[in-house]
Amino acid sequence: MIEPLLLGIVLGLIPITLAGLFVAAYLQYKRGNQLNLE
């Protein structure tokens, strides 16, 4: 049986990790476009 605390931590970290990767990819994509335009 999985501990509720561990399960809560995992469920809490997954959205944060996905959000962090999305923001990082967006910033890199935006930065790349700015460099290409210049």
From Swiss-Prot:
The keyword Transmembrane helix applies. It is found in: Cellular thylakoid membrane. InterPro entries: Cyt_6/f_cplx_su5 (IPR003683), Cyt_6/f_cplx_su5_sf (IPR036099). It comes from the Bacteria. It is a single-pass membrane protein. The keyword Membrane applies. Keywords: Electron transport, Membrane, Photosynthesis, Thylakoid, Transmembrane, Transmembrane helix, Transport. The chain crosses the membrane at residues 5-25. GO terms for molecular function: electron transporter, transferring electrons within cytochrome b6/f complex of photosystem II activity. GO terms for biological process: cytochrome complex assembly; photosynthesis. Signal peptide: none annotated. GO terms for cellular component: cytochrome b6f complex; plasma membrane-derived thylakoid membrane. Belongs to the PetG family. The 4 large subunits of the cytochrome b6-f complex are cytochrome b6, subunit IV (17 kDa polypeptide, PetD), cytochrome f and the Rieske protein, while the 4 small subunits are PetG, PetL, PetM and PetN. The complex functions as a dimer. Component of the cytochrome b6-f complex, which mediates electron transfer between photosystem II (PSII) and photosystem I (PSI), cyclic electron flow around PSI, and state transitions. PetG is required for either the stability or assembly of the cytochrome b6-f complex. NCBIfam families: PRK00665.1. This is Cytochrome b6-f complex subunit 5. It comes from Crocosphaera subtropica (strain ATCC 51142 / BH68). The gene is petG.
